[in-house]
Regions:
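A short glycine/small-residue-enriched secondary-structure motif
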Residues: 58-76
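Short, conserved charged micro-motifs
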Residues: 82-88
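A conserved beta-strand-loop-helix scaffold within acyl/acetyltransferase catalytic domains
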Residues: 2-63, 109-248
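Conserved GNAT acetyl-CoA-binding A-motif
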Residues: 100-112
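Glycine-rich, often proline-containing surface loops adjacent to acidic residues and nearby aromatics
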Residues: 71-72, 102-105, 136-138
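Conserved acyl-CoA
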Residues: 88-103
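A short, internal acetyl-CoA/4′-phosphopantetheine-binding micro-motif in the GNAT/acyltransferase core
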Residues: 71-82, 243-249
């Protein structure tokens, strides 16, 4: 007999999560996105005091969004969650939101390879529930299964040799260089006519809240920065390379 239930609202004290909450779904990060109205849903086993899944929506003008102002939100779930429970959880969420007066539900899933089994199920189940894809974004994912020095492919070796030949040097920057790294990337994008995806004030607030999750990198040639990137650790397995560029020279 099933012993899990679906609930609306925050978890009571004493509950243990059987899944990792991604950065953008953490309460602290959601409040950075907006301190307005949020609503949460969970799958729990009440007797065991454990939660198997969770999702959070920002409510505004009849629209429920997960996330509100972040690259992605959607459901975090235990790898042991039964597919049938996940499907019924989506039905429960939709029914409750519609009863609450919500007219539109927007869920932005992370890239499939972030959690392949969960994301594949979500894509199928949301389609079965007549959700439509309104935006599909391309991306690139690199599986890190070896060190930078353990290169087997010839093209990898060629790229490293080319970088050495033109005296490129990769440096990990300290967080006190955040403004300099941001300004470099921002200026590169401005010169190319690209928009900036984040303001420095928003970035600084997020870094201040989660300082241990960010990684700054710069590429130098003859002492001058020629490329830079800002990455953030979304969870224990994923480093998200979200803001980067290089100069045109």
């Amino acid at each position: 007999m099933e012993d899990f239930i679906f609930i609306k609202g925050t978890l009571s004290d004493g509950f243990k999560l059987e899944y990792e909450v991604s950065l953008f779904n953490l309460n602290e990060h959601r409040l950075l996105q907006s301190n307005g109205e949020w609503i949460s849903y969970h799958i729990i086993k009440e007797k065991k005091k454990v939660a198997l899944a969770g999702i959070h929506f920002h409510l505004s003008n009849g629209i429920a969004s997960s996330p509100y102002r972040s690259p992605f939100g959607s459901i975090d779930a235990s790898p042991d969650l039964e597919p049938s429970a996940l499907f019924r959880f989506l039905q429960f969420i939709e029914s409750d939101l519609l009863k609450s007066g919500v007219k539109s539900i927007i869920i932005k899933n992370p890239p499939t390879l972030f959690s392949p089994e969960l994301q594949t199920l979500l894509q199928v189940f949301l389609s079965n529930l007549n959700y439509q894809i309104i935006t599909a974004e391309p991306g690139a994912i690199f599986i890190v299964d070896k060190s930078g020095e353990d290169l087997s492919a010839n093209w990898e070796k060629r790229k490293i040799k080319q970088a050495h030949d033109i005296d490129l040097e990769l440096r990990h920057e300290e967080m006190n260089k955040l403004k300099a790294v941001y300004d470099f990337i921002h200026n590169c994008r401005f010169q190319k006519g690209y928009p900036s995806s984040i303001t420095f004030d928003d970035l600084q607030r997020t870094v201040s809240a989660f300082p241990g999750r960010f990684l700054l990198s710069g590429v130098y040639q003859q002492g001058a920065m020629v490329a830079a990137s800002i990455c953030v650790r979304c969870n224990q397995q994923v480093l998200y390379h979200f803001y980067s560029d290089h100069n045109t020279s």
